[in-house]
Amino acid sequence: MTNNTKTITLNLGPQHPATHGVLRLILEMDGEVVNNADPHIGLLHRGTEKLIEHKTYLQAIPYFDRLDYVSPMCQEHAFALAVESLLECKVPRRAQFIRVLFSELTRILNHTLNIGSQALDIGATTPLLWLFEEREKIMEFYEHVSGSRMHSNYFRPGGVVADLPEGLLEDIDKFIEQFPPKLHDIESLLNENRLWKQRLVDIGVVSQKEAMDWGFSGPMLRGSGIAWDLRKSNPYDVYDEMDFKVPIGKNGDCYDRYFVRMLEMYESIKIIKQCIEKMPKGAIKTDDPKLTPPTRAKMKESMEAMIHHFKLYTEGYDVPAGETYKAVEAPKGEFGVYLYSRGGNRPYRCRIKAPGFAHLQGLDFMSQGHLMADVITIIATLDIVFGEIDR
């Protein structure tokens, strides 16, 4: 007796709302069951790494905002740390606290979108609407410090571009006081919801070994029970002074990854509170005149200051020859920047390690044996953004 079962090849995307970007997925289906999932990437490739080679170190910063455009400040942070490492530049404490504060606000910004859109993919519309109200408040904080709601261009090698406006810390404090009850509301909708658990529990299971072998990081790694977080294991700026826990899952399924992200937001609130309480007075960028432009007041009084400002923004500054790799714990995982300098005002090579790139490669083994509808759930818990995957 011969088995004449015929598999079907199905194209999912790239114009599909559940692919979270321009993902083309070629699925080999046996009826409703997925045999293989082959992701085709590159539809949003802009050659960012090559473009950065032709820009000064200051001009390169906005390119990082446009990678994972849901969490821009975390990526600026990685690039700023890499340049500071080559320059051996000391960052003022106030600037370090501001960076950590906004990195954690960015984490909340990212996770609220992920959990909201994940719920929407599965059929629950309410969490998205509730969480978007909270995201709007964080985007206003972005706008207050940088003038932009999305592509902030706020972090700089040596500090941040501008100090916090008067009253902003009080506004952030009010936000984090009212935010936990909103998270409790989301949890009351989802955590023990029968349909939610049926769609997430035991779907897309990743063992600890598989997570390590595939190079997973962030909630994808911690969801499998590995307590690895760069803020703890390799702290940067003032994270070593912060008191927080690293949430981990047990089963490595979609439900654990959702829950890890939910718990991470509570930990981010703790860190933000500590930043507000400990925020020191002082400078917000290094006093090295080669890195920091003169103030507007000085430029109005001194021709030399005006020339200095013009030269700094047109020619930039020279960075000593050398190479470095700096990584931050971005909301999606380990975001790293390998920087190679030959001593000029432009990087010779800038290699970007995006966490979503590794996570998407694991979609094939995570989807095998599941139904077509479960693939949508798995894609949602990967938390992928094609700006950083395609670069």
Curated annotation (Swiss-Prot):
Pfam families: Complex1_49kDa
Keywords: Cell inner membrane, Cell membrane, Membrane, NAD, Quinone, Translocase, Transport, Ubiquinone
Catalytic reaction equation(s): a quinone + NADH + 5 H(+)(in) = a quinol + NAD(+) + 4 H(+)(out)
E.C. number(s) listed in UniProt: 7.1.1.-
Protein's name according to its UniProt entry: NADH-quinone oxidoreductase subunit D
NCBIfam families registered for this protein in UniProt: NuoD, PRK06075.1
Membrane topology: Peripheral membrane protein
Gene Ontology CC entries for this record: plasma membrane
Entry keyword annotation includes Membrane: yes
Upper classification of the organism: Bacteria, Pseudomonadati, Pseudomonadota, Alphaproteobacteria, Rickettsiales
Domain of life per record: Bacteria
Keyword Transport carried by entry: yes
Alphabetized GO MF terms: NAD binding; NADH:ubiquinone reductase (non-electrogenic) activity; quinone binding
InterPro entries named among the record's database cross-references: NADH_Q_OxRdtase_suD (IPR001135), NADH_UbQ_OxRdtase_49kDa_CS (IPR014029), NDH1_su_D/H (IPR022885), NiFe-Hase_large (IPR029014)
Principal cellular location given in the protein's record: membrane
Broad class of enzyme this protein falls into: translocase
Subunit and interaction comment: NDH-1 is composed of 14 different subunits. Subunits NuoB, C, D, E, F, and G constitute the peripheral sector of the complex.
Subcellular location: Cell inner membrane
Family, similarity comment: Belongs to the complex I 49 kDa subunit family.
Physiological role: NDH-1 shuttles electrons from NADH, via FMN and iron-sulfur (Fe-S) centers, to quinones in the respiratory chain. The immediate electron acceptor for the enzyme in this species is believed to be ubiquinone. Couples the redox reaction to proton translocation (for every two electrons transferred, four hydrogen ions are translocated across the cytoplasmic membrane), and thus conserves the redox energy in a proton gradient.
